[in-house]
Amino acid sequence: MLYPSIDNLLLKIDSKYSLVTVAAKRARYMQLENDKGVLPSYQSDKFVGKALEEIHAGKLVLQNDDK
């Protein structure tokens, strides 16, 4: 079973497309900047998994810039 589950993640960000975009951007940032992350520990070793864990923990949110 995958952690965190897609159902739990969609409670934080309502669109699966937005979820993928946010996770990919965060994972890329973590990789390029050698960022260790904002959580004390992670279950995943991969950057995308860490980004999804941050979303699940509420540390990473989507900001809408509707103008």
Curated annotation (Swiss-Prot):
Return the broad EC class.
transferase
Q: Which SUPFAM superfamilies match?
A: RPB6/omega subunit-like (SSF63562)
Instruction: Tell me the leader sequence span.
Output: none
Q: What catalytic reaction does the record list? A: RNA(n) + a ribonucleoside 5'-triphosphate = RNA(n+1) + diphosphate
Q: What are the recorded Gene Ontology BP terms?
A: DNA-templated transcription initiation
Q: Which UniProt keywords apply?
A: DNA-directed RNA polymerase, Nucleotidyltransferase, Transcription, Transferase
One GO CC term on file: cytosolic DNA-directed RNA polymerase complex
Q: For this protein, what is any one GO molecular function term?
A: bacterial-type RNA polymerase core enzyme binding
NCBIfam families assigned to the protein according to its UniProt record, in alphabetical order: rpoZ (TIGR00690)
Give the protein's recorded name. Answer: DNA-directed RNA polymerase subunit omega
What species was this sequence derived from?
Answer: Listeria monocytogenes serovar 1/2a (strain ATCC BAA-679 / EGD-e)
